[in-house]
Amino acid sequence: MIRNPQRRRLLGAAALALPALSMRAALAQDAREALGTLQGKPSGGPHPLQTLMQAHPAALRRELRGVHPRVFTTTAGLDALRKRAHGAERKTWQQALDKLAALRQPPAAAPAQKRRAQNETGIGIAGAALAYRIEGDPKYLDAARRYMDAAVSYPVWGYTFSKPDIDLAAGHLLYGLGMGYDLLYDVLDEAERKRYRDKLVRHATILADHFMPKPGKSYSYSQNHCFIPIAGLAVAAYAVWDDTPDAARWAALARAIFSRVLEVASPDGYFYEGVEYWIFSMPWIIHGLDAFAHAAGDDMYDTPNLRNTHLYIAHSLTPNGQDVFDFGDVFEGPVTRARKGEEPARTHPGGKLNSNYNLLYRLAARFGNAEAQGVADWMASLGHVCAEDFWTLLWRDPALAAAPMSSVAPHRHFDDLGTVYWRSDWTPAATAFAFRAGPPEGHHVTTRIGKLPDWHLETGHAHPDAGSFILYGGGGYLTGPMGYAGIPSSKLSNTLLVDGQGQANEGGGHDAFRGYPYARLDAIRITRAELGRERADIVAELAGAYRPELGVDTLQRRFSYAAGTWTVTDQLRAARPVVLTAQVHGDQDIAAAGAHGFVVEGRAASLRVEAAAAARAVIEPGVVVAAGPPGHVDQGPTEERGTVLRLSLPAAREARLVTTLSLQRRRA
């Protein structure tokens, strides 16, 4: 038995070498990743983005030129919002005012290199500026000015040591300072306007020059380091449209990149970077699209991904409403679920998930989608937190009736990403699971990537976890992955190893799929998903996940559920004798229970595991290379998170392993 494995421990020399600025979710990359842009060999003809920029310039509407505010709303729009804020929406608006960051704490002082410090400054400006225009109280104006002055004081927008002035913080500050400049234009004196305008123009110029198309340049369109900075650029472009002729070029660039971002998104609504990155990055899709829709009259919303994404986040929540089905780089696995360490203050303030659910109100309003409205209301009822509560006033349509969660199917197969979610119902007492078997960015990439020479993949936040599952029951999380990793590995998920080796090109850095043929990944697929009210039966083909030199000819995993028991049947055929290993992870202790049985302890319930007689069992700590600082995310400390049971069959060319996992509820 392994005692108290959910605690996080730093192991070996890597722990002693942990950089002072180690930032798990400073949302970093390793030196081999090209998040945003990549300069390759030039090819003939104009760059595709140049063609898009000319075809869709996204110019500021003529009636908005020379007036402020204009980016997200107008003076007339503010009047209507003020009536709602002081009328039917008073309670919601007051809650947003109570949470304004700019009223609760001072902005980070320059150079503001602590993780997320500059992000918070940008968001703080936006909230305080809107609050002043609704309330007229000088305290909000004073707060906005403090935060805007802080943004101006930062010599570098972002980290001085990793992508300065062109990355996430630059996007946040262009958005915040641009929104503040636009909303407060009429109450700022000329010296203030010039100071803020000059800073906006300077940093928008730097960022736009970096992202401007050049022969051979490609973009990680599907990755958040691309579209978050560009969303900020769009806001800044419309805010200073009258002040610099370059703003038109910035807007056209931002619109062109966003058109690609939407084009490459999975049509089933799934976000391949995982739930944590959906929470962090999806608001920026909304901010960018809202800027184009309002300022340019260019509505780009109507895409399959955005019509379906409310179902992704709904199904990603475990029945307790506060944890998630955490495929990929999501939180810290057992540590976060135990609400230990520093991260829960950010991920679960006050014990409630920071989910940014209010962005669903915007999608519900845009599509007239009662189901999306209902999902947002449900998440609100769970006490979820939003980074920008103040947007609810603009995003939520109070006239749109919300569909109850009982009307949403409790199971869904996201067929592009190859992920199935199932639950017995939408109550906290439900039994639930998720099963994943698909390529990291979805099957649609196979036909799309060759047609878009300006798109390159950066899949570091996806894990080599094909065939893995997450189980929930008896009021608690039963088994699942180990969380965010600097070096993702199949050993961190409930999937299979072949001769002790995991999937794709794991072990070579943060992106386990770098250099691995996507056509081979596309062969990973769910071939059957029969989902019913009381049972489920899923079959997946996994051979494509493993490197050819491992000799796997076929590898099939069948995953079935009925009456509180999951049955996993793995069948392998290989070119030479290999050892097949199945894995089951636990947040707490795993102990032997009989000749071939094991118990995975949980906080609310436990999981009984029964293995084939021939399987050799090993129970050991779960070991993770955690994330390092930006630019070196693959050089983080080695940590223990939870425990893992590994069941291995003797080496053979053909192997069949059957494992049953049964929910054991606590006795009252």
Where is each model-derived feature located?
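C-terminal segment of N-terminal export signals and the immediately downstream linker at the start
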Residues: 3, 24-59
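N-terminal export signals
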Residues: 9-28
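Membrane-interacting alpha-helical segments
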Residues: 38-49, 92-111
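Hydrophobic alpha-helical membrane-insertion signals
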Residues: 50-52, 59-99
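Short secondary-structure junctions and interdomain/linker hinges
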Residues: 67, 71, 88, 92, ...
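Aromatic-lined, polymer-binding surfaces characteristic
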Residues: 75-78, 106-320
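Extended polysaccharide-engagement surfaces of secreted carbohydrate-active enzymes
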Residues: 277, 282-668
